[in-house]
Amino acid sequence: MIQTIYEHYGLRPNEFMPVGKFEGFQYRDILYTIINVKQMEQDELNELYQMSQFLMGQGDRHVATFMPNLNGEMITETETEKFIICRCLAEEKNPNFSPGHELAVFHQKGRLFPYEVEKANRLGQWKSMWEKRLDQMEQFWYGRLRALPNQEMEKRFLETFPYYLGLTENAIQYLVDTEIDDLPRSVDAATICHHRFGQKTWGEDYVYKLPADWVFDHPSRDIAEYIREQYLLTYAVDEGHMHQFLSEYEKVNPLSSFSWRLLYARLLFPVHYFEVIEGYYSVQDEKQKQKYYEKLEGVLAHSSHYEAFLKRFYQSVGISTSRYHIPELTWIH
């Protein structure tokens, strides 16, 4: 890869380093991130390029921009590789970095994006995407049920899937009811979001915002996924941290009742369960399979804690469900 980068970009990395879920390198005061785009369509890359250029124009100096190769092309393709390189300033993260405030400002700027988004758009698609994911796993579950597997992980999947099917159906119904009963406000306009926003999405030591992480969606997506990740790190809720994150966000972007309900619907959808099951069946290596099995055991061992977290969510963030006319789920124990 070092020789490939030199031939196509005129840069010779001394060593590679992890940049989030990607690989990259630093040269002088610039951080370069190598992103495999074999699975991405050209139209989606064009949209992400437009978003990065727009946010740079809005004054966000931490946004990574697409770097053209020596031929002036954004995508570099060899016999075995198809990738882009994004670059940004290698600026160390301030100790006082506030994820809630920074995310709110990011959403505020992204809301002004003036171009139509098609390939990277997820707005209004949660229901269909969740239904598709659920249907696929349900069909797979029926297939494994007939096969009578004897591996422990598969037995656990067969035992537990009906519960998570029910949880997913509740998430879908809560989402549908929200879209019927409530009205979006101006703060509910689509903006530039992330596939799964978390504590490390914008880096640990350095601050970077990578276009490959982005989608165009409702801002509650990022807030929900950040809160979910915080819970899953320890299977507990640091209410002080959650309050601070939400308070800092709302100082810039106050959330409507519609936002709160979408946020809650997303927390109800057990994406963490789906990812563990899908991950297990997508790998062949036994060590990796064992890691997924251990993750599943963690999820299952704390399923009642997650229900308790969902039950107390509105109360724990100080939201009056009666004032906002927000329905609460009676089946959660």
Predicted regions and their residues:
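ATP-dependent phospho-/nucleotidyl transfer catalytic cores
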Residues: 15, 120-192, 294-298
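ATP/Mg2+ or Mg2+-diphosphate-binding catalytic cores
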Residues: 274-333
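Active-site activation/catalytic loop segments of kinase-like enzymes and analogous catalytic loops
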Residues: 220-254, 267-286, 293
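All-alpha amphipathic helical-bundle segments outside canonical DNA-binding/catalytic cores
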Residues: 121, 257-265
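ATP-binding glycine-rich phosphate-binding loop
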Residues: 1-29, 67-71
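Short acidic/histidine-centered micro-motifs embedded in hydrophobic/aromatic stretches
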Residues: 69, 265-266
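ATP-binding pocket architecture of kinase catalytic cores
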Residues: 30-119
